[in-house]
A protein has these predicted regions:
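Active-site bordering "gate/hinge" segments
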Residues: 1-129
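Sequence-level detector for tyrosine residue identity
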Residues: 21, 34, 58-61, 139, ...
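Structured core elements
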Residues: 30, 79, 91, 132-134, ...
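Short, glycine-/Ser/Thr-/acidic-enriched flexible segments
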Residues: 36, 85, 97, 138-140, ...
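A broad structural signal for short, well-ordered beta-strand segments within beta-sheet-rich domains
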Residues: 75-78, 145-147, 157, 188
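Short, solvent-exposed amphipathic alpha-helical segments in soluble enzyme
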Residues: 96-98, 149-153, 207-209
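Long, well-ordered mid-to-C-terminal structural blocks that present hydrophobic/aromatic surfaces
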Residues: 125-182
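Dual-mode signal for accessory low-complexity, basic/Gly-rich regions
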Residues: 159-211
């Protein structure tokens, strides 16, 4: 436990030092993870799909996403409901705009910010933001989480569970070690809507989501 506290403190200090000497608003970078032949017999097709994903027409996505933004900028709240047996039920509180003609809550994120294109995002108002986020399967930093559930109140995680192990204690420890990193509370830093489904389709088609 003492080592975990030291690790959290070290990471926090390292982050502050990085931002002090390498300010985030003064640098930019792009990382593209191209597949290697070891990915399987479909390597040529998968490689072509990855190239396609990373060279989509960003102008088309920019127009689509601007329509989404203009609609969301008229809202104070966004309600997110899971489909079928997905238990997601979230309320996102948006910042109030004084003049929607001159102001916006959202970043129109295309290839000048991220490659591949495909999302609009904002930082929510923590007060009033809450509910449950349920993801049936997700990979974070190379680790799989099954039936991941995060419960939010006032925009912060107050409870959590997953179904990777047999006991609740093991599952909670897995989340604490690999998502929360032993912070007592983690705020919801971003609310985003993705528009690029090309990567998801390719991952499902070739069974490479875990690679």
């Amino acid at each position: 436990e003492k080592q975990e506290e030291l690790l959290v403190a070290m990471n926090g200090r390292a982050g502050r030092l990085t931002n002090e000497y390498l300010p985030g608003d003064e640098r930019s970078f792009t990382i593209i993870a191209y597949p290697v032949p070891e990915i399987g017999n479909d390597f040529p097709k998968i490689f072509a799909e990855i190239v396609k994903i990373n060279t989509l027409d960003y102008k088309q996505y920019e127009r689509i996403q601007q329509t989404i933004i203009e609609t969301l900028d008229t809202c104070q709240w966004v309600e997110i409901k899971g489909k079928d047996d997905n238990e997601t039920d979230l309320i996102i509180h948006l910042h109030e705009l004084e003049d929607v003609r001159k102001q916006t809550n959202f970043e129109n994120c295309v290839a000048d910010v991220n490659i591949p294109v495909g999302e609009v995002f904002t930082s929510p108002v923590l007060a009033g933001t809450g509910g449950i986020l349920h993801v049936k399967k997700v990979y974070l930093n190379g680790l799989q989480f099954k039936d991941l559930k995060l419960v939010f109140d006032c925009g912060q995680v107050i409870d959590y569970s997953c179904a990777n192990f047999e006991t609740e204690e093991e599952n909670r420890a897995y989340i604490e070690d690999n998502i929360l990193h032993h912070h007592p509370k983690i705020p919801m830093g971003e609310f985003a809507i993705g528009t690029n489904t090309t990567a998801y389709v390719a991952a499902e088609k070739y069974g490479i989501a875990d690679k």
